[in-house]
């Protein structure tokens, strides 16, 4: 099996220092430099999720810059690889990184099946994974880990914020179009629970393979169901394709609503506002939310000329918090001590205010409900959302005692 080549980035080179005398140092002796701290980002950099994950390495670079380029005197080196949305590929990369390359932390990990596979290896090795891309709430439930974190969003929060809002707006009957792997199944499960709890009903559903090109048969079933809402429990190019083809079938014009249950700003830009206008969705980050997000985005665009997604911002946030914790502990070698420090320290950065990393690994943060603007409301190509509501983290995320995490007694 061919493992994707690592793309390496060394943390900012610190200014060369003069020799420091410790006891008697021979003239001309060069002080040994400590080995770099190696961290890594693994994601679906090609294929169905490629557009979402572009820029994650640059986001990690920004986090390294924001701790001064070094941690406890050590430079920071980034490794990067594409897991191709295949759990076996992701697992092989993780093992090599941990066993051969000496990586101390892996982040990214979009695609829940890959994240679950890497989580097992990280736990086995006693090393840290911070999952920013995968959505399955099982990652802070049955698959929680003492050295694992689930950082940006999960299926429970997406269901709670988007699903509840649509049911309250009258969308009380649902049909699901679901990606047939762990993420899609978890999202359908969690949204169904919210719909039923709010007094709605699920009238049916159909599952599709990852990277489906033709959704016609699935959309015809959804149309025939007469459900008020068609829930799209998929992501990336699958979401884009299904929304475009739903438009061709006249589904929205016929009175049914589409619920994009995991939609990113990059998806909306690919769809264009005439196609996506009116779509209600949940995100943890939007570049135009406030002055701080706008300033961060300007800095990011100097490295990567594109609109950052919440995945990009999430990789920045996870990396920054990890590096701060390592700095505070003094070493990355004891993962349990680093994780304890990460839980102790509140998370405060461009996308999170007073976030709390719980014992089950769930980062509790505020989530934002947006609606896609109509073309007439948009001032420029990146002006795509209007804020409907901000939901506090303790309302958006599953209560600690309900997740079935074996670490919680």
Model region roles, listed by residue range:
Residues 1-38, 404-409:
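Short, low-complexity disordered leader/linker segments with a strong preference
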Residues 35-52, 173-177:
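Short beta-strand segments enriched in small/hydrophobic residues
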Residues 243-318, 327-333, 376, 383-408:
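Extracellular/periplasmic periplasmic-binding protein-like sensory domains
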Residues 37, 346-409:
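Solvent-exposed, acidic/polar segments of extracytosolic/periplasmic ligand-binding ectodomains
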Residues 51-58, 66, 70-141, 151, ...:
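Beta-alpha junction/loop-to-helix N-cap segments that form part of ligand/metal-binding clefts
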Residues 97, 101-110, 130-132, 175-178, ...:
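Periplasmic-binding protein-like
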Residues 83, 137-140, 210-211, 252-276, ...:
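Venus flytrap/periplasmic-binding-protein-like
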Residues 92, 137-140, 145-249, 285-295:
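Extracellular/periplasmic Venus flytrap/periplasmic-binding protein
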